[in-house]
């Protein structure tokens, strides 16, 4: 019997996959527990339509991420963060990714989640830094951050 998996079933199939399984297994376990449904022509065409829509949305997200990357990596986009510093240009405390995200939103109206800003360690000195931002799993942008003393 052909079924469409509604969720991942270990050793049998992944969500959205159409597969031929034994009749008893399909009727008594997969369909009964809501893990799969019979693969009728209507169900298969609906699945293909859904997969097509998901692919279209993924392509739109990727295009949007690339536009945002060009906006972030523009030469004029330098995020300025002010912090208290000592005489040897070391900061009192540090600059975390949250503060960089807030400054980016205030200065350029670009909203980026703080978890997407990739700081190996917090910034602890004045000056310019290049910071990576993971906008999309396939798109990473680099922003210039200028740390200045208050």
From Swiss-Prot:
InterPro entries: Ribosomal_bL9, Ribosomal_bL9/RNase_H1_N, Ribosomal_bL9_bac/chp, Ribosomal_bL9_C, Ribosomal_bL9_C_sf, Ribosomal_bL9_N, Ribosomal_bL9_N_sf. GO terms for biological process: translation. One of its GO terms (molecular function) is structural constituent of ribosome. The keyword RNA-binding applies. The keyword RNA-binding applies. Binds to the 23S rRNA. Belongs to the bacterial ribosomal protein bL9 family. This is Large ribosomal subunit protein bL9. The gene is rplI.
């Amino acid at each position: 019997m052909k079924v469409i998996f509604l969720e991942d079933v270990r050793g049998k199939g992944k969500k959205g996959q159409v597969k031929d399984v034994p009749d008893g297994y399909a009727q008594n376990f997969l369909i009964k527990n809501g893990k799969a449904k019979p693969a009728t022509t209507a169900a298969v065409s609906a699945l293909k339509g859904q997969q097509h829509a998901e692919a279209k949305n993924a392509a739109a997200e990727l295009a949007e991420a690339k536009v945002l990357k060009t906006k972030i990596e523009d030469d004029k986009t330098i995020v300025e963060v002010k912090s208290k510093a000592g005489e040897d240009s070391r900061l009192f405390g540090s600059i975390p990714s949250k503060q960089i995200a807030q400054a980016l939103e205030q200065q350029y109206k670009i909203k980026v989640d703080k978890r997407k800003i990739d700081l190996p360690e917090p910034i602890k000195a004045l000056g310019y830094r290049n910071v990576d931002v993971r906008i999309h799993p396939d798109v990473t942008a680099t922003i210039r951050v200028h740390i200045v003393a208050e």
